[in-house]
């Protein structure tokens, strides 16, 4: 008798991806974040769908509709806070997932890595547009400031910004189109995730040692399914603790004030997960320069496969590179902190130094240290 799981055209694909998939026997908890990101995406799409049933994308009613969701819809407050804090969890998992890739040299899988960077950019775009939808003060001014950055593009900048706005300022047209894009993007992300997995399964997973693990593979189910379930339980516990005890911990109080084009908040800042990039943007006094630095701070990830000069794939046996990696992590924490501070001394200088250090470590120090370690191997 043939097994349906292995012969059915559709179930066969699922089987090869999540059941009979040969996986390295030594992958650590750092490999859990892929499945956690899948869970986050599912949570966001589901909660987002239910929110969209009650939300209205009109400047006059958007803020009121969010209030209505929280006050009058059954468990609307829960759905809204799951969606808002689910985004934070999404980014925590994303940053850890990317960090894992950098540490263990997973970026040598070119296609998987590049699709991953595109995914990161798509999730960031989705989160930005979602933040605009409640139409609070920070939503409005965040949208104004960030979309205005495109005006730094020579020649077409101003036209481009007005085209995105659908008018001469952030208004009804902007809100409506942002809602449309915010709705469609998660489905595009889901499609990209499938491509990401397709490319990953062409090569198989990397592992902490960075060595080829073809000689020692185990089936994904039950070993890694049970491990993923543990990760999922921990993630849900963390998320629900955040939602039920301090749902506004990561939000901005300014967003509880309805959008007012006539009054600018004292400190315009994005959600915490964009602060590192925002700090890099602000650390350059020139508008176009700042925008380029902002874009490059994310796209620089695509250069990692080219900057990999070490003879070893993983950093597991490279103490000098490990040291530089953790300095880079500390630098990103510093940038995140600076992004939330006002533009004044000493924060400006700290931000500029942290931005310079960020690019220097990635473009110069890590490759140099890799070469030094190659030399040390010969001793």
Swiss-Prot record:
Q: Write down how the cofactor binds this protein.
A: Binds 2 heme b groups non-covalently.
GO BP: any one term: mitochondrial electron transport, ubiquinol to cytochrome c
Report if keyword Mitochondrion is assigned.
yes
Predominant localisation class: mitochondrion
The record, for Pfam families, names:
Cytochrom_B_C, Cytochrome_B
Compartment(s) where it occurs, according to its Swiss-Prot or TrEMBL record? Mitochondrion inner membrane
Q: Provide the binding site for heme b b562.
A: 83, 182
The cofactors named for this UniProt entry are: heme b
- The record's disulfide annotation reads none
Keywords of this protein's UniProt record, alphabetized? Answer: Electron transport, Heme, Iron, Membrane, Metal-binding, Mitochondrion, Mitochondrion inner membrane, Respiratory chain, Transmembrane, Transmembrane helix, Transport, Ubiquinone
Positions with a binding annotation for a ubiquinone: 201
The entry's heme b b566-binding residues are 97, 196
- Membrane topology per record: Multi-pass membrane protein
Q: Which InterPro entries match?
A: Cyt_b/b6_C, Cyt_b/b6_C_sf, Cyt_b/b6_N, Cytb/b6-like_sf, Cytochrome_b, Cytochrome_b_C_euk/bac, Cytochrome_b_N_euk/bac, Di-haem_cyt_TM
What GO terms fall under cellular component here? mitochondrial inner membrane; respiratory chain complex III
State the Gene Ontology terms under molecular function.
metal ion binding; ubiquinol-cytochrome-c reductase activity
**Self-association or partners: how does it assemble?**
The cytochrome bc1 complex contains 11 subunits: 3 respiratory subunits (MT-CYB, CYC1 and UQCRFS1), 2 core proteins (UQCRC1 and UQCRC2) and 6 low-molecular weight proteins (UQCRH/QCR6, UQCRB/QCR7, UQCRQ/QCR8, UQCR10/QCR9, UQCR11/QCR10 and a cleavage product of UQCRFS1). This cytochrome bc1 complex then forms a dimer.
Q: What does this protein do?
A: Component of the ubiquinol-cytochrome c reductase complex (complex III or cytochrome b-c1 complex) that is part of the mitochondrial respiratory chain. The b-c1 complex mediates electron transfer from ubiquinol to cytochrome c. Contributes to the generation of a proton gradient across the mitochondrial membrane that is then used for ATP synthesis.
Family statement drawn from the similarity comment of this UniProt entry: Belongs to the cytochrome b family.
* More info: Heme 1 (or BL or b562) is low-potential and absorbs at about 562 nm, and heme 2 (or BH or b566) is high-potential and absorbs at about 566 nm.
The protein in question is named Cytochrome b
